[in-house]
Regions:
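Short, basic interhelical loop/turn and adjoining N-cap
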Residues: 34-46
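General secondary-structure propensity
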Residues: 26-37, 51
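DNA major-groove recognition helix of helix-turn-helix
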Residues: 48, 52-55
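Short acidic, glycine/proline-enriched loop segments that cap or flank alpha-helices
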Residues: 39-40, 57-61, 80-83
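Helix-turn-helix/homeodomain-like alpha-helical modules used for DNA recognition
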Residues: 80-139
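Short Lys/Arg-enriched helix C-cap and helix-to-coil transition segments
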Residues: 56-74
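Short, amphipathic alpha-helical "recognition" segments used to contact nucleic acids or chromatin
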Residues: 4-27
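Long, compositionally biased low-complexity regions that are usually intrinsically disordered
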Residues: 139-146
Length: 149
């Protein structure tokens, strides 16, 4: 599997946003990334789907690289209202918990990226407090579920 380039990450973000906004179909976005940007079709589908999951605050189960996470968060912060950045951070934290439950790996660099956004002042204090409380609660629940297994 070849490494996904920054150009492919940028294109995947643009296509993912276009799908999210209803401007193009998911299949068109994937095909365009595959043909126009030489991106593996499965990776293209994962990245486009993950952009939508970030914007909607939903857990995503197909991982993407740290460079993509950094790029996606920076663009969401620039392109959308604060609530979308909050949703994206929530989605990443949910992914971290999901990944921890299936692989026993903590994804510390991804968690640090979220922490940087939470402490950077980009989000209003009330949003930072809410997201930190949610993350603490989700972590406690995951630890309890792990202990029961």
């Amino acid at each position: 599997m070849s490494k996904i380039s920054i150009g492919q990450i940028e294109a995947a973000y643009e296509k993912g946003v276009a799908v999210h906004l209803g401007k193009i179909r998911f299949s068109e976005a994937v095909e365009s990334l595959h043909i126009d940007h030489a991106m593996n079709a499965a990776s293209a589908a994962d990245y486009v789907g993950n952009v939508g999951n970030l914007l909607n605050g939903r857990v995503y189960k197909r991982t993407f690289n740290l460079t993509a996470a950094e790029y996606f968060l920076s663009r969401i912060a620039k392109d959308f209202p604060e609530s979308f950045l909050s949703a994206a951070i929530s989605a990443i934290k949910l992914h971290i918990e999901y990944y921890r439950s299936v692989s026993k790996t903590n994804l510390p660099q991804l968690a640090a990226l979220c922490d940087r956004y939470l402490t950077s002042g980009v989000l209003k204090p009330v949003e930072r407090t809410r997201l930190s409380a949610e993350f603490d609660s989700e972590t406690e629940n995951a630890l309890q579920m792990s202990a029961q297994q």
